[in-house]
């Protein structure tokens, strides 16, 4: 049996999509100079080659790809967006606006000066900023009629220009941002590591702001004469065992009766006590604990230690510092703090926001008691609330179709903005109502990444046919403008953040990278800072920048 592979792929668009995805994802794992190409570049290059070979793509599949992507971006941003915007928005919003206003200005004036065709400037800016939301906003403005296409151009040609501009500028944007992350920390006067340590000292952090994560252990001891002498008649509150060592007494057996002690309890000779703490905490116990006979009793040691992710929801807790939680009162241990999927430094002075996730371990009843106070335990379920997911998706599309009229001017927000807003709403409601709209993070990541990759396949296949033709005609101009769009806004943001906003350099670099939504550069800055402190700045600008970039794409294509 003979199989014509080319004909098979041309007649089966779904098969073509996944063939390009599989080859592109495999290609993305290739490393060049210790840097992995990544999924986006792998899929983009593969689809460009396939497009150049004459393969085409279904435009409807391209549309569903970007819709799913932008909707999931909104859901991820929702839990933290309003808190960041209204509480810490001054610096983060300013930096995001500096980056985008500068990028839009350079793209608009440079493309007009160079005489680039309609659509190339928006695609080029999206690629230079490595920001797919810019491209999504521009394309949706065309689909909704918000942007007017020149009379001498076909709609398909404009979409092709968007794709070509994006594809040609993407590598320029990614490489230049990574170079910025490597070079600018060296060129500035302040050492990034020193800046991170300064924040660490001001906020009570130690070292890198990281710690190993492991569950506490339980050990039991019989109270002997040495320990009685050490306690000197003081109650547990006065002894401050937790403050000194990080261990706390979970149970006491006295005269055969098990009990949970309170702060007023006084140890007596012959008591058997169960202590909970990390291994290094047990090692800090006074020798009079360990010199007593260690007890191996199933009933005494039968404690259920759990590790849960607690989502901050309470209005009384949001806006307070981590130190205000007084975890020692609950006998709980904090392992990590996660905001916008970014692990934060273990900073006792970090201000909590709704939607923050605290990974806490301890005895089950104590952890659940803490969760009732600050929010709720994240549902560890593999079942997504598809009804809410689909309903808000529909609402987003419907909202984007609403036409508003001002005098003789009519316009609609379009699918991109509508889905972004509905996604933010769903994410926000999910952060405040644990049983509503739950989507496992793994499932959300898969839908978002799949939508983005399908969108990238469409971009590459659409651009591939004309890619080399454009390279010979306007390639140098697009690459030159893309370099300016990628680099100049970053330097402006650095100057504004450093000398106008007076931001700490470690936080500033994280915030700039968040404004550029360039995750690969984040690891480089953390490495230079020898800390995860820059992640505080990254999380602050990331949610805001994703929203503004979608609007920037819409604005630029309208102005072009």
Curated annotation (Swiss-Prot):
Gene Ontology terms: biological process: potassium ion transport
One of this protein's Pfam families, by short name?
Answer: Asp-Al_Ex
Name the GO cellular-component terms: plasma membrane
Instruction: List, in alphabetical order, the Gene Ontology terms for molecular function in this entry.
Output: monoatomic cation transmembrane transporter activity
Query: Any transmembrane segments, and where?
Result: 5-25, 37-57, 66-86, 91-111, 164-184, 386-406, 409-429, 443-463, 478-498, 506-526, 539-559
Query: Does the keyword Methyltransferase feature in the UniProt annotation?
Result: no
* Domain RCK C-terminal intervals: 203-292, 293-376
Query: Where is the protein localized?
Result: Cell membrane
Q: Which UniProt keywords apply?
A: Cell membrane, Membrane, Repeat, Transmembrane, Transmembrane helix, Transport
What the record says about family reads: Belongs to the AAE transporter (TC 2.A.81) family. YbjL subfamily.
**HAMAP family to which the protein is assigned, alphabetical:** YbjL
Q: What is this protein called?
A: Putative transport protein VV1438
């Amino acid at each position: 049996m003979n199989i014509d592979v080319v004909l098979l792929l041309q007649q089966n668009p779904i098969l073509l999509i996944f063939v390009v995805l599989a080859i592109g994802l495999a290609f993305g794992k290739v490393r060049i100079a210790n840097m992995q190409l990544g999924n986006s570049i792998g899929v983009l290059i593969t689809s460009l080659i396939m497009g150049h070979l004459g393969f085409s793509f279904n435009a409807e599949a391209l549309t569903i790809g970007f819709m799913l992507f932008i909707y999931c971006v909104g859901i991820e941003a929702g839990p933290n967006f309003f808190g960041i915007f209204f509480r810490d928005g001054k610096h983060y919003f300013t930096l995001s606006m500096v980056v985008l206003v500068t990028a839009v200005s350079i793209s608009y004036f440079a493309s007009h000066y160079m005489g680039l065709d309609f659509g190339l400037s928006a695609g080029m800016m999206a690629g230079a900023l490595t920001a797919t939301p810019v491209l999504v906003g521009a394309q949706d403005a065309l689909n909704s009629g918000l942007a007017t296409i020149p009379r001498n151009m076909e709609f398909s040609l404009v979409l092709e220009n968007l794709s070509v501009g994006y594809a040609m500028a993407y590598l320029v944007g990614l490489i230049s941002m990574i170079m910025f992350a490597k070079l600018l920390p060296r060129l500035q006067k302040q050492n990034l590591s020193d800046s991170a340590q300064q924040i660490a000292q001001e906020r009570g952090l130690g070292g890198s702001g990281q710690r190993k994560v492991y569950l506490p252990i339980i050990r039991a001891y019989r109270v002997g004469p040495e320990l009685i002498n050490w306690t000197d008649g003081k109650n547990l509150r006065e002894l401050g065992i937790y403050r000194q060592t990080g261990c706390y007494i979970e149970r006491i057996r006295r005269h055969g009766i098990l009990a949970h002690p309170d702060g007023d309890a006084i140890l007596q000779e012959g008591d058997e006590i169960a202590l909970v703490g990390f291994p290094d905490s047990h090692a800090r116990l006074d020798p009079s604990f360990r010199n007593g006979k260690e007890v191996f009793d199933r009933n005494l040691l039968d404690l259920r230690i759990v590790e849960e992710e607690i989502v901050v929801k309470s209005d009384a807790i949001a806006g307070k510092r981590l130190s205000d939680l007084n975890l020692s009162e609950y006998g709980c241990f904090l392992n990590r703090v996660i905001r916008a999927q970014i692990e934060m430094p273990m900073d006792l002075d970090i201000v909590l926001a709704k939607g923050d996730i605290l990974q806490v371990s301890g005895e089950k009843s104590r952890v659940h008691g803490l969760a009732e106070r600050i929010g709720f335990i994240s549902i560890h379920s593999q079942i997504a609330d598809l009804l809410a997911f689909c309903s808000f998706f529909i609402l987003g599309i419907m909202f984007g179709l609403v036409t508003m009229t001002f005098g003789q001017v009519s316009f609609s927000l379009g699918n991109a903005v509508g889905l972004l807003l509905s996604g933010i709403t769903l994410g926000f409601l999910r952060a405040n109502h644990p049983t509503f709209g739950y989507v496992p993070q793994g499932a959300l990541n898969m839908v978002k990444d799949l939508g983005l990759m399908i969108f990238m396949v469409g971009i590459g296949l659409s651009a591939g046919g004309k890619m080399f033709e454009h390279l010979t005609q306007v390639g140098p101009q697009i690459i030159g403008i893309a370099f300016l769009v990628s680099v100049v806004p970053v330097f402006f943001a650095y100057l504004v953040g450093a000398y106008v906003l007076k931001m700490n350099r470690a936080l500033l670099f994280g915030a700039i990278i968040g404004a550029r939504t360039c995750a690969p550069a984040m690891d480089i800055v953390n490495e230079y800072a020898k800390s995860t402190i820059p992640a505080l700045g990254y999380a602050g600008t990331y949610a805001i920048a994703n929203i503004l970039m979608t609007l920037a794409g819409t604005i630029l294509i309208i102005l072009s």
